[in-house]
């Protein structure tokens, strides 16, 4: 595995390296705020070694028509199965039990030493009525994947409370099954400095501190900075000209809550 492009994350890299080298199946949950680099970390660590990747899709007002929501997520899951090698002659799954049976079929046809499954944006994939999907995920793990001894299943999500309630502290099929839990934090100021140096920014310590106070250590925001601008111009662009942060305010709450209005009202009142 190659870690050359990753800034910091030494503890997390050591965990992922260990699970790849282990001689048993591993079930890993990764959570942390949006834009903090969860998907990037997994993709950079494992790359093409990931045999199957599914990504949950945000659907506005999904709680108002759950069956349509579920079928769309299942359709996307099926597309990922086909990309992973499932024959298009196989019928599309109509429920999560069928979906995970098809995933098992795909993996049984692979001869890889370690079979890595990456399920990203799990809260969106499971949906407003998440119990069915989580129950079937637990059954998939307990009835087959765990005993195979060569499966690595990584689930990832930005909705922290959801991940804690439904995966990490689950009292159903996933209870006590996680072999590793990773909470990914923003970059420290020191890691931001490494980022700037690696990307040819010529900043004083003062400018680095100004940047950190303005946008924190969020890799997504750091990636929007340009090394041919002063830090003042970069911050002006992000907050005003490009309206990146203004749009982020809308996107973050939309992505985390099905009914965001009351949370937005609270933040606006505090501000």
What is each of the regions a protein language model found here?
Residues 1-271:
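Phosphate-binding site recognition
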């Amino acid at each position: 595995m190659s870690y050359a492009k990753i800034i910091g994350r030494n503890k997390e890299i050591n965990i992922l390296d260990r699970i790849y080298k282990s001689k048993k199946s591993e079930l890993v949950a990764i959570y942390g705020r949006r834009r903090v680099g969860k998907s990037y970390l997994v993709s950079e660590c494992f790359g093409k070694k990931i045999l199957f990747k599914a990504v949950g899709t945000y659907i506005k007002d999904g709680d108002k028509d759950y069956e349509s929501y579920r079928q769309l997520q299942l359709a996307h899951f099926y597309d990922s199965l086909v990309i992973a090698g499932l024959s298009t002659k196989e019928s599309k799954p109509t429920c999560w039990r069928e979906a995970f049976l098809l995933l098992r079929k795909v993996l049984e046809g692979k001869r890889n030493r370690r079979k890595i499954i990456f399920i990203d944006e799990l809260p969106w994939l499971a949906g407003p009525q998440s119990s069915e999907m989580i129950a079937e995920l637990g059954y998939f793990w307990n009835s087959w994947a765990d005993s195979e001894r060569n499966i690595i299943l990584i689930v990832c999500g930005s909705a922290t409370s959801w991940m804690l309630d439904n995966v990490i502290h689950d009292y159903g099929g996933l209870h006590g099954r996680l072999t590793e839990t990773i909470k990914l934090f923003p970059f420290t100021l020191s890691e931001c400095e490494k980022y700037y140096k690696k990307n040819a920014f010529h900043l004083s310590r003062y400018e680095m501190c100004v940047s950190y106070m303005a946008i924190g250590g969020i890799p997504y925001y750091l990636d929007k900075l340009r090394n041919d601008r002063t830090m003042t111009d970069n911050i002006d662009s992000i907050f005003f000209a490009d309206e990146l942060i203004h749009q982020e305010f809308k996107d973050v709450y939309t992505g985390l809550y099905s009914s965001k209005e009351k949370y937005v009202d609270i933040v606006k009142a505090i501000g």
